[in-house]
From Swiss-Prot:
Belongs to the glycosyl hydrolase 72 family. GO terms for cellular component: endoplasmic reticulum; extracellular region; fungal-type cell wall; side of membrane. The keyword Glycoprotein applies. Residues 394-404 have a biased composition (Acidic residues). Disulfide bonds join 71-100, 215-348, 234-265. (1,3-beta-D-glucosyl)n 1 binds at residues 89, 159, 295. The active site is at residues 160, 262. It comes from Saccharomyces cerevisiae (strain ATCC 204508 / S288c). The gene is GAS5. The keyword Manganese does not apply. Residues 405-462 have a biased composition (Low complexity). Residues 463-484 form a propeptide. This is 1,3-beta-glucanosyltransferase GAS5. A lipid is attached at residue 462 (GPI-anchor amidated glycine).
Length: 484
């Protein structure tokens, strides 16, 4: 019976992969040259003009790309906005995404996807524990699910994992995930899909973080793209007052594409005017930045929404019309935008206690995960799996003592601009996101509890005991003399 189920999973995966490759052939993949994105067919410079898209909130376990009715409702609205890219924070890798991905492709919209979920991510409390084979199985299964879609622009290995000076040690494990993802993509013979990191704009370590993820002699361990969550331009600001001029200097020698993975300060009296669009898509910034994504599509509790959703009804807010107007009137720079062809990667920052505590020697990939490189990740486990459950459990006491930390890094941190300081005097408070804050711990705990209700005996095994299917999968394969 189990073998029959696993065989069925193989057939389903093959069918979805075939649907993916046949549905997106008309969408040219995006490739990287120097520090810029380019259309692989036309050769034109590609600038991200997008929005962050996660109806229900970015720490929600709901997958917006697995519900055909949601995509039928929202994609025409996204098309009307004039965008070419969406960023999605959480997906269920066990679901069928072919309808939504095809609809996005038909409307010229690319996807940047975070591979983590609120219950499967690198834990800030114990990154070493959460970096385990079961976590990587979930990451690799997400890659398997989406890699055949040409309109997947890239994957984020982490989002705002480093949200304070005290969490810089987690960078070591996120960088290991970058390495593992890039090696997995190569081993599975997928096209060269960019893998990056989305950073909080924290003055104390933003330069160190950028350098760290782009340093070292091992190319697979260096990111392909760097996203910055930046809320420094508020209202009718300017290139200098907002601090954008400082960011230009900071990243001017960066060898991979840099873009704003979240932007759109809402600390304004009424609606957001989005005057920063004129700067972002100008020759003043195009030599370094490749566009950005506005936070966010749907209006949630933090009031950053462009639209209000009520069932199947979408109401466009004033912010939507303002952004649409800015996108429509501001063209991309002509030619290649002055991009750099330099491939000089950064020098690794030195370890310094209390300042930068990331190690330049990365941990070896968990040995149990090596089988996935030849066989694939196996059956996707979806959002019901909690790969950091044992890590969170042993840190319960720490959670009670530290209200400001978040327990995972799957989406954005609960207060992006509070942690992401800038030269601008304003402070933004982006309240929902992928790395649940202490106030959101109950969501993560509930999901973990639901997952473990029938697996209470696994706790003694550590994180490796949480996902059993892949181990059984490998054992059966070996029994039938399959090469893994």
């Amino acid at each position: 019976m189990l073998l029959r189920s696993l065989t069925s999973a193989f057939v389903l995966s093959a069918g979805l992969a075939q649907a993916a490759s046949s549905s997106n052939s008309s969408t040219p993949s995006i490739e990287i040259k120097g520090n810029a994105f380019f259309n692989s067919e036309s050769g034109e410079r590609f600038y991200i003009r997008g929005v962050d898209y996660q109806p229900g909130g970015s720490s929600n376990l709901t997958d917006p790309l697995a519900d055909a009715s949601v995509c039928d409702r929202d994609v025409p609205v996204l098309k009307d906005l004039g965008i070419n890219t969406v960023r999605v924070y959480t997906v269920d890798n066990s679901q069928d995404h072919s309808h939504c991905m095809k609809l996005l492709q038909e409307n010229g919209i690319y996807l940047i996807l975070d591979v983590n979920t609120p219950t499967s991510a690198i834990s800030r409390y114990d990154p070493a524990c959460s970096y385990n084979a079961d976590y990587l199985q979930n990451v690799f299964a997400t890659i398997d699910t989406f890699a055949d879609y040409d309109n997947v622009l890239g994957f984020f290995a982490g989002n705002e994992v480093i949200n304070s000076v005290n969490t810089t040690n987690t960078a070591t494990y996120v960088k290991a995930v970058v390495r593992d993802m890039k090696k997995y993509i190569k081993a599975r013979k997928y096209r060269q899909i960019p893998v990056g990191y989305s950073a909080a704009d924290i003055v104390a370590n933003r330069q160190l973080a950028a350098e760290y993820f782009n340093c070292g002699d091992e190319a697979d361990a260096r990111i392909d793209m760097f996203g910055v969550n930046d809320y420094s331009w508020c209202g009718e600001s300017s290139f200098v007052v907002s601090g954008y001029s400082t960011k230009m200097k900071l990243y001017q020698d960066y060898s991979v594409p840099v873009f704003l993975s979240e932007f759109g300060c809402n600390q304004v009296k009424s609606s957001r005017p989005f005057t920063e669009i004129e700067a972002i898509y100008s020759t003043q910034m195009s030599s370094v930045f490749s566009g950005g994504l506005v936070y966010e599509y749907s209006n949630e509790t933090n009031n950053y929404g462009l639209v209000q959703i009520d069932g199947d009804k979408v109401t466009k807010l004033t912010d939507f019309e303002n952004l649409k107007n800015e996108y429509s009137k501001v063209s991309n720079p002509e030619g290649n935008g002055g991009y750099s062809t330099s491939n000089n990667y950064s020098t690794c920052p030195d370890y310094e206690k209390g300042v930068w505590e990331a190690n330049n020697t990365l941990p070896a990939m968990p040995s149990a995960a090596s089988a996935y490189f030849t066989s694939g990740a196996g059956s996707p486990m979806g959002t019901g799996i909690a790969t950091q459950q044992s890590c969170d459990a042993k840190d319960d006491d720490d959670e009670e003592d530290d209200d400001t930390s978040s327990s995972s890094s799957s989406s954005s941190s609960s207060s992006s601009s509070a942690s992401s300081s800038s030269e601008s005097s304003s402070s933004t408070s982006k309240a929902s996101s992928s790395s649940p804050s202490a106030s959101e711990t109950s969501l993560l705990k509930s999901a973990a509890s639901a997952t473990s209700s029938s697996q209470s005996s696994s706790k003694s095994k550590g994180a490796a005991g949480i996902i059993e299917i892949p181990l059984i999968f490998r054992a059966l394969a070996e029994l039938y003399n399959l090469v893994l």
